[in-house]
């Protein structure tokens, strides 16, 4: 009898293990969890971290990457428009640096493909850092600490290319894993509330997922702002930055076309859109429904979607953003 009982107990234990394994299996969803933070050359990462916080990259030593991309403020600065080296606001809202390495293009209009090219342009931008690469290299080369750091990371020392590469290497580590939604997709289906799961379903049912999908929940395609209505006419006060990719291509099909922003950490990165016109997540959801989807959802559905969006907030340095 004891052998039979033991056999049955063993079968039940195995079945429980099998059931637990099945319940923990990753979900097959259009939204994918973030990958692990890549393990990169530590000397380059640390040098990139120092350069990220280095105001000598700007022409008057007043502005660093971290001035606008604050890692304690969602990777941006929560301002409508960041302040350039000259004390004047730029004309486009600063996107988060977190998870930027997962975007298929950089900048709102997608004008460059890589983080290195993004760094190159920001430093010489006449409204951002206002410097030039010859000056940057000369200033950094004059500092023994940077001489040593570059020699440890790069055989050829301080060069513009190496500055750009070090910064890009550091930025590739700026991922925000372990959001509650990522844990859900990885198989912990109990971590979301019923309302948050309903919100995710509404997000899919209304078609938000058509543009906001993939590992970065956006950042992987272009889309016109104002598919179902003239957002810019309704807003008024036209800006050059409103033209989007048209500024690059001069193609009418690209007028008001932008890179779809990532929704990761969206609850902590207000204000929203390239023009910072939506001060709250609620306002942003309203605009999306009206001008991108042409839908008129119930307040309950909007509230549920917002609850879902708040589950996309990840962690940085082991702490929730």
Q: How would you describe each model-predicted region?
A:
Residues 2-5, 22-321:
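Periplasmic c-type cytochrome electron-transfer domains
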Residues 10-21:
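Bacterial N-terminal signal peptides
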